[in-house]
């Protein structure tokens, strides 16, 4: 095995092991014991190899972290998988809850319930099982309630580099036309999931 092939194999292994979290070129350079520039060159070689060959994965970059992802041309097959109960779409309650968590994280269930005006336990369970939110700590004070926040998968699923890419929230009363647009947004969002 050539020296370059050995380094490529190490980088590919690191990409696999880090999964959805991905890994930065700086971290790869430190672990493989090469320069960051060489890592970038090797990532380009690996990306080209994956594009040329009949492989089910590709190299993706998000927020200066690299990871292995599935190829877009296999999306129909993955949609079939997503239609299973574990990977199914989200209810309106779950979408509302997800939006609240995304914008107000870290946040407790009681705080979510207060914003929504109804209980959110089932919606939270659904979002946790779909890996869109996770426990991110405990609130201080009596009871030490669980705090929820979004996951890296949430960012990836919605094509965001970071939470700063979320649209700005504007406190306004929606007229009927705007409400219809909001409903269409939630319908599209649910269809995408």
Curated annotation (Swiss-Prot):
GO biological process: cell division; chromosome separation; DNA replication
Disulfide bonds, paired cysteine numbers: none
Keyword Magnesium among UniProt keywords: no
Superkingdom of origin organism: Bacteria
Annotated GO CC locations: cytoplasm
InterPro entries: ScpB_csome_segregation (IPR005234), WH-like_DNA-bd_sf (IPR036388), WH_DNA-bd_sf (IPR036390)
Subcellular location: Cytoplasm
Alphabetical keyword list: Cell cycle, Cell division, Chromosome partition, Cytoplasm
Entry-linked PANTHER family: SEGREGATION AND CONDENSATION PROTEIN B (PTHR34298:SF2)
Record text on subunit structure and interactions: Homodimer. Homodimerization may be required to stabilize the binding of ScpA to the Smc head domains. Component of a cohesin-like complex composed of ScpA, ScpB and the Smc homodimer, in which ScpA and ScpB bind to the head domain of Smc. The presence of the three proteins is required for the association of the complex with DNA.
Family per similarity comment: Belongs to the ScpB family.
Known role: Participates in chromosomal partition during cell division. May act via the formation of a condensin-like complex containing Smc and ScpA that pull DNA away from mid-cell into both cell halves.
Name of the protein this chain belongs to: Segregation and condensation protein B
């Amino acid at each position: 095995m050539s020296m370059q092939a050995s380094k490529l194999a190490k980088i590919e292994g690191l990409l696999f092991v880090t999964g959805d979290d991905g890994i930065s070129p700086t971290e790869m350079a430190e672990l493989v014991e090469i320069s960051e520039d060489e890592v970038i060159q090797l990532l380009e070689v690996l990306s080209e190899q994956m594009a040329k060959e009949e492989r089910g994965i590709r190299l993706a970059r998000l927020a200066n972290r690299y990871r292995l992802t599935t190829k877009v041309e296999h999306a129909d097959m993955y949609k079939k998988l997503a239609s299973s109960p574990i990977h199914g779409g989200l209810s309106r309650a779950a979408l509302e809850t997800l939006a609240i968590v995304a914008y107000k994280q870290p946040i407790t269930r009681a705080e979510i319930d207060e914003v929504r005006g109804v209980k959110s336990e089932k919606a939270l369970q659904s979002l946790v099982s779909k890996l869109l939110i996770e426990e991110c700590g405990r609130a201080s004070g009596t009871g030490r309630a669980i705090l929820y926040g979004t996951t890296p998968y949430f960012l990836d699923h919605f094509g965001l580099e970071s939470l700063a890419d979320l649209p700005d929230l504007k406190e306004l009363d929606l007229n009927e036309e705007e409400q219809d647009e909001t409903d269409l947004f939630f319908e599209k969002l649910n269809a995408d999931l």
